Amino acid sequence: MRQKTISNKNKQTKNTNNISLRRKLGLMYKKAILVLKIVLMIFVCLFVFTKYFTSIKTYLITNIYQVTTKLGFRLENVIIEGQQNVDELTILKVLNANKSSPIFSLKLDEISNNLKKSKWIKEVYVSRRLPNTVYIKLFEREPIAIWQINNQLFLIDEEGYKISKDIQPFSHLLHVVGEGANIYASKLVLELQKYPALLNKTLVAIRVGDRRWDLNLKGNISIKLPEKEFETALKYIDALNKTNKLFNQNYKALDLRDRNKYYIQKY
């Protein structure tokens, strides 16, 4: 019995030693892997984010471009969607690549950021369509009016953003004048678009006190719109126009600021 007890104790001791050794080896292995990962990460950071190994990087990248180009990954087509007012040559100039250039050499983020420098472009999406096409989707700003401020004229979009000083191609748009007119022009234009005949006869919309609008119509007719709910006043003016009671009544001014009582002045 005593010999068996001693034998069992020896076996337990050996098992304990084996487990302890395996644990130590396991910990050493984990530490070695961790150190290897850290070294590898440092090497990658040095390779990518520093000037070390510049010649090696250049050599590798150049060879990758050459190989992929031979495999057909080269620029052959450029698809542009959403382009209306931005000059196509300007877009291609920003692309800055010749036909058959390595398609992977194109820096898409840089192209996108450079395109956004155009005041016409609100948003842009650039992607590769492998193996040989670059796709450019433009979201241009849509001009809604011509804004006059400090004796200068600007083409503006629905947000009041100044797109361009070249207003000639858009001379048919509503002319808005005054401080803040660019910000509030969108709502006025949207309402006037409900009455095309009235919009067509509106020459200028003047922002008064940054609170309300005065409209100057053809025939030297001036209309003072209310500060609030000017939509009702526009509906009234359109009704007068449709019944031929606006432009052939010798009207000089219509004061519609008081919704309960309208004032009409004749020449």
From Swiss-Prot:
Can you list the disulfide-bonded cysteine pairs?
none
Q: What is its main location?
A: membrane
The alphabetized list of GO BP terms reads: cell septum assembly; FtsZ-dependent cytokinesis
| PANTHER family cross-referenced by the UniProt entry | CELL DIVISION PROTEIN FTSQ
Q: Which residues form the POTRA domain?
A: 73-141
Q: Keyword Hydrolase: yes or no?
A: no
Q: Where in the cell is it found?
A: Cell inner membrane
Q: Which residues lie on this side of the membrane: Cytoplasmic?
A: 1-32
Give the Pfam families listed for this entry. FtsQ_DivIB_C (PF03799), POTRA_1 (PF08478)
Gene name, per UniProt, is ftsQ
Q: How does it sit in the membrane?
A: Single-pass type II membrane protein
Q: What is this protein called?
A: Cell division protein FtsQ
Where, by residue number, does the polypeptide cross the bilayer?
Answer: 33-53
Write down the species. Answer: Rickettsia prowazekii (strain Madrid E)
Q: What family, per the record? A: Belongs to the FtsQ/DivIB family. FtsQ subfamily.
State what this protein does.
Answer: Essential cell division protein.
At the top level of its lineage, which domain of life is listed?
Bacteria
Identify the keywords attached in UniProt to this record, alphabetized: Cell cycle, Cell division, Cell inner membrane, Cell membrane, Membrane, Transmembrane, Transmembrane helix
Please give the InterPro entries that the UniProt record associates with this protein: Cell_div_FtsQ/DivIB_C (IPR005548), FtsQ (IPR026579), POTRA (IPR034746), POTRA_FtsQ_type (IPR013685)
- Ranges in the Periplasmic compartment? 54-267
